[in-house]
Regions:
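Short, glycine/acidic-enriched loop or turn micro-motifs at the edges of active sites
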Residues: 64, 74, 100, 123, ...
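Bacterial N-terminal signal peptides
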Residues: 18-27
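Bacterial N-terminal signal peptides that target proteins for export
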Residues: 3-18
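Active-site HxH/HxHxD metal-binding segment of metal-dependent hydrolases
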Residues: 74-162, 243-247
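Metallo-beta-lactamase
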Residues: 88, 133, 162-250
Length: 250
């Protein structure tokens, strides 16, 4: 796809709420990233999928190979290729929220891996609406199967020697969640917090007041060195966002 086509797609179909459109353009123009690294004893890969440049994450214990996939929004075969290349046994597929660009690959990935799907109870109704929602933007997505379990504030999910904590951050959607790995010092923020921006709040269940309040009280209180990996665009840190994010008083 050409750069002009990508610019047109973003500018015409995704409103520039809180700078998100510009953030997405930067992601897409960088091309389809598929980056991998080991963070201590953990395999960590970012797989950019779909025309909206969603960051899908593969996390796994480097010894036991138990792992999770977060937000397989599209291009399930690309996600499954990363799973296979790393020899990962996927225990769970987690959705940060239920918007179509983050859930479009749920069905294929869960069917191929046998992983249990998890999403918040508030956002679960979106799972059966992905195809219809995508057509509103001239795109396509598969409806998702129902979840095996619901995510809620304070839940802990283990894979190998690693553990993530669920943090409920409403505002981009009613049931938006972030995933915090304290030992590894990283946060998967979905579409709640971006590099020097926040998620759009003009969709059903959205509220800028709720979103900003939750980010300030639940995310900006994490250690400043915590690395933040958002649903679109480049990584950042809690310290950087406290200082420079204009939507958070930075």
């Amino acid at each position: 796809m050409s750069r002009n086509r990508l610019k047109t797609l973003i500018s015409s179909r995704i409103p520039a709420i809180a700078g998100t459109a510009l953030l997405l353009i930067g992601t897409l123009l960088a091309g389809c990233r598929h980056t991998g690294q080991k963070r201590g004893t953990m395999i960590f890969e970012t797989i950019v999928v779909g025309e909206l440049g969603v960051n899908c994450y593969l996390l796994a214990d480097s010894d036991t190979k138990e792992g999770i996939v977060i937000d397989p929004g599209a291009e399930a075969e690309k996600v499954l290729a990363a799973v296979k290349a790393n020899g990962v046994r996927v225990l769970y597929v987690l959705n940060t929220h239920g918007h179509f660009d983050h859930i479009g690959g749920n069905r294929r990935v869960t069917e191929a891996t046998g992983a249990g799907l998890m999403i918040s109870r508030e956002d679960a109704p979106f799972l059966s609406q992905a195809a219809r929602s995508a057509t509103m933007y001239g795109l396509a997505a598969d409806n998702s199967p129902p979840p095996a379990a619901y995510l809620a504030e304070g839940d802990s999910i283990r894979f190998g020697r690693h553990e993530l904590k669920v943090i409920h951050i409403p505002g981009h959607s009613a049931g938006g969640c972030c995933f915090y790995l304290e030992k590894e010092g990283l946060l998967i923020s979905g579409d709640s917090l971006f590099a020097e921006s926040i998620g759009r709040t003009d969709l059903p269940g959205g509220s800028q007041e709720l979103l900003v309040g939750a980010i300030r009280t639940k995310l900006l209180t994490l250690p400043a060195e915590t690395r933040v990996f958002p649903g679109h665009g480049p990584a950042t840190s809690i310290g950087h966002e406290k200082k420079y994010n204009p939507y958070l008083g930075g």
